[in-house]
Each structure stands twice: as structure tokens, then as C-alpha cells.
Amino acid sequence: MDKYLVKMPIKSTKNVVSEEKISVKEEKPKPKKVVKEQSAIANKRKNLDTPEIVNKENAEVENPPKRRSTRVTRSTRSMADVGTPSPEKEIPEKLPFIKYRGAIKYFTESQEIAASADEVMQWVDQQTHTEIVPMAFDMEWPFSFQTGPGKSSVIQICVDERCCYVYQLSNLKKIPAALVALINHPKVRLHGVNIKADFRKLARDFPEVAAEPLIEKCVDLGVWCNEVCETGGRWSLERLANFIAKKAMDKSKKVRMSKWHVIPLDENQLMYAAIDVYIGQVIYREIEQREQTKLKNEAEFKEQNGENAFKAVKALGETFLTKINEVTL
């Protein structure tokens, strides 16, 4: 058995330090060393606005704030705090869903669609107080991953937030002349998101529609939003509803990818189609109001402060969507 025994070295008590002594040594503070380390960190971060500086009074003496150059500033709010808003930069927030409670007028036959378009044209002609009548425009068609996009199946329009028109084209070989005349009416300003692509598709599917005249006079809401609000990027209708109208849209994939060519449309499809043009009309009105406010604020500022001050403020990122209360040089 002795050969399997391992002889362990005997610890010497001479080199053993008691645990009490060790703990005392570790607890001794070293204020001088800490101060040197902190001062070294502060020197490395000199001229930087950092919360790690321990002595604020000494830091302010060593690093006085840089003197700002003389320029036009605004006392009411910062002009470019978060940069240019864009669809990619928008922070998702919980917004109430759009609820449309207006009328939905749905037609599938050529004669019914023509009569309805005539009715809308008469309403447009009666708007004598304005030279332009905005009309939200959108389209729907079936889509298959095997065969791609189908023929244009639905046109929906909205000229008044209380009523939306849904025209299903599935049974039509040609679009009624009255509907073509309506969308080409000189007072009508068609608007939507990516609306130019819709007109090109409509012209391919129905040659009696000329795309270019419609493209020349239409308004893309995303482009207009970037011009007025000085935002950037490409907008979807859903993101515009979030940003401009502060509303959420229920863009159900099941409804969006449904069979739009099948007659009749169900209630979910009709509501989906109506909400698209209804919220488009709401967004148009809101951007229009912001544009008018912006032009008014710009004119008042130029009159009070001059063209040079206006250019200086614009260079700082001011949009003039709200009124400037005070300006200092």
C-alpha cells in the first residue's frame, strides 16, 4: 500500500500571513493614486463635454466653453434637433386605427359606373369657390407569385371625406367615357402614393386611358410631404398616415392579396379600398394646410427680419411650419 501513497508537502507557518492582516491591507484607501488616475482621465478628455469629470469647478476653469459665432438663433426651440425626418427614421408609436364611417358607393356595371362618374363631375362643377378639387385615387388588382400582377380590377376615388366610390372593372372591356372624363377633368387634382405607376398600369390594361396627361397634373403625396415638411425618403401610404394624420392603418395581407377581380367584393375588401382613398384625402388636406402655414410664416419673417436673416435661419434647418416668436443675432 505504501507505493500508492503520495507524500504531500508540509506547509510552513513562517510564510503564512494571517487573513486579518490581508484584509487590513486591502481596505487601506489610496487617495493619492485615485486622484492621479482621475486627473489622467480628465486630461485625456480635455475639451470634451463629459460627465466623467470629477471636479466640475476645476474642469470649467481648465476647459472654458467655446465661444459661439454670431448667427441667427431661435429662442423658442431648436431648429434641427433630430435631423431630417424620413420614413426610415420614424419611431413606431401606438396610434389609433383609422375608422371610416362614411358612405361607400360600389358599382360593377358599365352603365352604373358611367352614371356615378357623371354625378361626381356635376358635383365638381358646382364647387365654384375653388379652382382645384382634390381627388384621392387608388387602384387594386389581384397578384399571384406564379403569374405576377393581374389586370386592373378596382378604381377607388374620394372627393369628399364623407363618401368614397369603388368601381370594379372586372366585367368591363373598356372604361366608361364618363369615368375617363372625370379623372381628366381640368379642375380635378388626382393625388395618391406612387400614383404615377398606377396611371401607367391603368393605361396598359385599358388603352383608352392616356397616362401622360394624368401624370403631368397629379400629386404624389410622398413627394409633396418632402417638399412642405422638408423630410426625406420614400413614403408609403401607411407611413404617411402615421406621420401626417397620426393614424394607424390595418394593412391586412389577407385583404391586400385577395381576389380583387371576383365580383362581388366582400365587406372587408370594400372597407379596405375606401379607407385607402379616405385617408389619402385627409393627408392631402393636412399637407395643404401645413403648406399655407409655412408660406405665411416665411412671408412674415422676411418682412420683419429681412432676406439675409431668412436665409440664415433656413440654413440652420428651420421649416417655418410653426411661427418663430423671437430671433436674436
From Swiss-Prot:
The enzyme's E.C. designation: 3.1.11.-
Which residues participate in Mg(2+) 2 binding?
A: 138
> Mind listing the UniProt keywords for this protein, alphabetically?
Exonuclease, Hydrolase, Magnesium, Metal-binding, Nuclease, Nucleus, Phosphoprotein
Q: Which family does it belong to?
A: Belongs to the WRNexo family.
| Cleavable signal peptide | none
* Family annotation (Pfam families): DNA_pol_A_exo1 (PF01612)
Q: What does this protein do?
A: Has exonuclease activity on both single-stranded and duplex templates bearing overhangs, but not blunt ended duplex DNA, and cleaves in a 3'-5' direction. Essential for the formation of DNA replication focal centers. Has an important role in maintaining genome stability.
Q: By its UniProt entry, which InterPro entries does this protein fall under?
A: 3'-5'_exonuclease_dom, 3-5_Exonuclease_domain, RNaseH-like_sf, RNaseH_sf
Quote the subcellular location field of this record: Nucleus
Q: Locate the Phosphoserine modifications and list their residues.
A: 78, 86
- Name of the protein described by the UniProt record: 3'-5' exonuclease
The UniProt regions of compositional bias labelled Basic and acidic residues, in chain numbering, are 46-65
Q: What is its main location?
A: nucleus
Q: Where does the source fall among the domains of life?
A: Eukaryota
Q: Which GO terms describe its biological process?
A: negative regulation of mitotic recombination; nucleobase-containing compound metabolic process
